[in-house]
Amino acid sequence: MVVNPKVVDISKIKDYEDLADPSLKGKVCLRNRKSPYNQSLVANQIVNKGESKTKAWLSKMISNVSQPFFPGDISIIRAVAKKKCGVGIVNHYYVARMLAGVNGRRDALYAKKTKVLTPNPAHVNISAGGVAEYATNKNEAVKLLEFFASPEGSKGLAAPTFEHPLKEVNQNEIVKNFGEFTPDSVTVEDLGEKNSLAIKLMKDAGWN
């Protein structure tokens, strides 16, 4: 999550459930329902909390949304920096890229006005690879995947995108400064099984 300490009391935001607190009325920014990241987050909540509690959480959180839903993470970070909202759900690496100046000086200044908060445990999105059943170069494909799973390959894959490396290797300093966290133990299979229900609950709650 990304927050503006001048708009919200960050000591009161520890978890995703806290975004449903009435004190955040008009201060929450979210991407639209089509975002697979948010669909997975809701599926994660269903697995951990159950359908009933997730439905109640969604209803209260959506009532706190400050304005129409955003098309992407960067626009949310900008809105938080401009105090149009106080907290938003985003992927950390968008903030990291902005801080690094990848998007230009203006976005770097916006990002510096915000702070990244990571719940413990945190919902984690992953990058994955596989080998097609009828691939003609299976041996080479397997070697490539094995390289990406190595410390060197993991670091090389994560560095330009500011993601967390798969292996225990040195992280980008910007990402490292966001702090340590515990990944949620929910599996990809679990998220896939609950995805359709997650979308339904999001729609029912008014998450457009």
Segments from the language model and where they lie:
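Extracytoplasmic ligand-binding site segments that recognize negatively charged/polar headgroups
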Residues: 1-84, 98
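A bilobed periplasmic-binding-protein/Venus flytrap-type ligand-binding module shared by bacterial periplasmic
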Residues: 1-7, 43, 125-138, 156-157
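Loop/turn elements at helix/coil->beta-strand transitions in domains of secreted/extracellular proteins
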Residues: 24-28, 83-86, 111-113, 138-141
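Periplasmic-binding protein-like
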Residues: 26-34, 58-63, 67-70, 108-133, 147-171
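Short, solvent-exposed loop/beta-turn-alpha elements that line the ligand-binding surface or hinge
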Residues: 50-63, 106-109, 180-181, 190
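An extracytoplasmic/periplasmic, membrane-proximal ligand-sensing/linker region
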Residues: 52, 163-208
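A ligand-binding cleft/hinge motif common to bilobed small-molecule-binding domains
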Residues: 86-110
